[in-house]
Curated annotation (Swiss-Prot):
Its main location: nucleus. Component of the NuA4 histone acetyltransferase complex. Residues 104-115 have a biased composition (Basic and acidic residues). Residues 135-329 form the MRG domain. Residues 5-62 form the Tudor-knot domain. This is Chromatin modification-related protein EAF3. It comes from the Eukaryota. InterPro entries: Chromo-like_dom_sf, Chromo/chromo_shadow_dom, MRG, MRG_C_sf, MRG_dom, MSL3_chromo-like. Keywords: Chromatin regulator, DNA damage, DNA repair, Nucleus, Transcription, Transcription regulation. It is found in: Nucleus. GO terms for molecular function: histone reader activity; methylated histone binding. The gene is EAF3.
Amino acid sequence: MLYTDGEKVLCFHGPLIYAAKILKAEKWTGEENVTGQVGPHYLVHYDGWKKTWDEWVPETRLLKHNDENLARKATLQEAAKAGSLISSAEKSAASTSAASSLKRAKDSELPDRKSASRGTKRSREHVEAEEEFLKRPEVKISLPDELKLQLVDDWENITKNGQLVPLPRNPCVKDILDDYRKHYLASKRSDPSKQRSPQLVDEVLKGLKLYFDRSLGQNLLYRFERAQYVDYRKKNGPKMGDGDVGNARTANGSMGGEMEPSNVYGAEHLLRLFVTLPMIIVHTSMDAESISLLKEHLAEFLSYIVREKHRLFVREYETASPAYHRISST
């Protein structure tokens, strides 16, 4: 057992890490249990929480209580605060927009009563559409704990250590998606009982590639990486990553195939997409059933990333030169 009774630890609870204490340690052999997993399990008590929150957790949710992991804990909390602010700002902006629409509909008075009726109806429909959007349930994509740690390490390497992901990456995002498709369809041949639809997985992977290519330049880079991105574009293709997920005109392929971000960047940046993906999905017209099916496919894809993480993620980030630091700070 990696942890012992009474040991202070750090434990994942949802997307964040909390200080906790091991109350009891057991090795579970049957899958019929509260976690559905076998192997070492620990009864933990979260510091400062009521005993009703005590729970059994598998070993994968625990971290040693040391300075390195405490830094990870703080980083995740900072990221969560930033995410909450963004979410609140978006909801506030949407609410303000709806309120403004209501006011415009109320204040507008046209001489032609028939035209006024049509205008009021359009305004009312617009407001109702916005209000309906605000009522839509939040889309959550659960990242495996190993990938949460990967995100934290990635953030620290770039923003704290001044390092960069070497470009181009091998495998790149396109390679990863192609490899996953082969793996997904091969699992059907090895287990015919599994329902595997080539058309469905193709749609999911096509969507991931599209979102990645259109989001990379605007949403998936840390500030320190932007100079590298600009330099690579100058040398290899100025249109790389110019797309916008919400812009149908640019979404129809405004850049050359070899210059697409999915041919240049790899798993490190693809993983960041899954942080912003819920906000992208909630802005689509997908119904609840389609979203549920998509989430199932994304969960399976993330499990594949975990299994292949040693092959997919870069082993060593490159240290940026003093000249790069000067450029990136301007």
